[in-house]
């Protein structure tokens, strides 16, 4: 299951909820008629419960959504804090040189000298660009996920090649 975001609060009295997205193109989720919800982002696939999308739109600087069968504020409050996910095959295909963060987690990171720098543990968004959090034992590197540093992403080989020195 790919985690897409989290329900952060109820919105209004008709069952709508505020959504905090974890990616940069959450409006594409509207193409999926069904979402999945779970209490834990790391929950096994069997713990994710499907919900049918009744509405989804931008609201101010955020997003709001409504689900079939969740028609009042009490129902929306019951969803607060739950994670939103979807199976990989339900997601829109990313464009060339675009990746779902979940596909990058666990990839090995090597530099141009073929030195192993570690494994992608997480990603974070800084506003300016995304950053790879690369773990190598007790060491952590933060590598900007931009073309100047990320030279190649090979999902099949499970590697990311970067222009980054081992001692940085």
Curated annotation (Swiss-Prot):
Keywords: Chaperone, Cytoplasm, Ribosome biogenesis, rRNA processing. GO terms for molecular function: ribosome binding. One of its GO terms (biological process) is ribosomal small subunit biogenesis. GO terms for cellular component: cytoplasm; ribosome. Residues 96-168 form the PRC barrel domain. It is found in: Cytoplasm. SUPFAM superfamilies: PRC-barrel domain (SSF50346), Translation proteins (SSF50447). Its main location: cytoplasm. It comes from the Bacteria. The PRC barrel domain binds ribosomal protein uS19. Binds ribosomal protein uS19. Belongs to the RimM family. An accessory protein needed during the final step in the assembly of 30S ribosomal subunit, possibly for assembly of the head region. Essential for efficient processing of 16S rRNA. May be needed both before and after RbfA during the maturation of 16S rRNA. It has affinity for free ribosomal 30S subunits but not for 70S ribosomes. PANTHER family: RIBOSOME MATURATION FACTOR RIMM. This is Ribosome maturation factor RimM. It comes from Aromatoleum aromaticum (strain DSM 19018 / LMG 30748 / EbN1) (Azoarcus sp. (strain EbN1)).
């Amino acid at each position: 299951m790919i985690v897409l975001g989290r329900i952060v609060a109820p919105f209004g009295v008709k069952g709508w909820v505020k959504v905090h997205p974890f990616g940069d193109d959450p409006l594409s989720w509207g193409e999926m008629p069904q979402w999945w919800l779970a209490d834990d982002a790391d929950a096994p696939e069997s713990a994710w419960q499907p919900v049918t999308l009744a509405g989804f739109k931008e609201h101010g600087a955020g997003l709001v959504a409504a689900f079939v069968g969740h028609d009042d504020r009490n129902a929306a409050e019951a969803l607060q804090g739950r994670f939103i996910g979807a199976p990989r095959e339900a997601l829109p295909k990313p464009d060339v040189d675009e990746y779902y963060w979940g596909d990058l987690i666990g990839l090995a990171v090597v530099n141009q000298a073929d030195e192993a720098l570690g494994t992608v543990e997480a990603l974070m968004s800084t506003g300016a660009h995304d950053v790879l959090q690369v773990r190598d034992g007790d060491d952590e590197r933060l590598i900007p996920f931009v073309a100047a540093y990320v030279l190649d992403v090979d999902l099949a080989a499970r590697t990311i090649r970067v222009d980054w020195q081992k001692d940085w």
